[in-house]
Amino acid sequence: GLPLIFSLYNKFKSVEEVRKRLVFTTHTPVKAGNDIVPLKLLDEMNFFGSLPLAEVKDITKTEGDLLNYTLTALRFSKIANGVSKIHQGVATQMWGNEEGICPIVSITNAQNANYWTDHYLKKHLSTNQIDLLIERKKELKQELLNEVANQTGKLFDKNVLTIVWARRVTAY
């Protein structure tokens, strides 16, 4: 996390040396998702190690009494990743005019199909065995519904269309 920045700065006494070692992934390009915390509170928690507060404000380019975690990470990183092209564009629009930030590029979160794809589903799909494919999907759905029941006590029928949303909704 962010204390790593100050630990590295304490060690090397150079923002440039910290930048050589730090890459940041920005996950939330909406204002509400980026923590801004009182410097005094962080100092009382020894967040900055042995650095005096005046030096922290100077190296982070912080004006006022609040530290923006994301902006600090962007200023101390050699590069930042947005987790998609859209995310990169929104993050660049959001932070791009700030002084001293690193470039923000896009990366795509990798998916390992061999790990995440069921062997039998893949086999039945590739051999066009639709009946076996449907049967296997129902077996896997029942496994999932059993897990849901074990964790929540809620029972669902595998023969009923069940729609779930497992991703947070973003503003961009």
Feature roles, as predicted:
Residues G1-Y172:
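Catalytic cores of carbohydrate-active enzymes across secretory and cytosolic contexts
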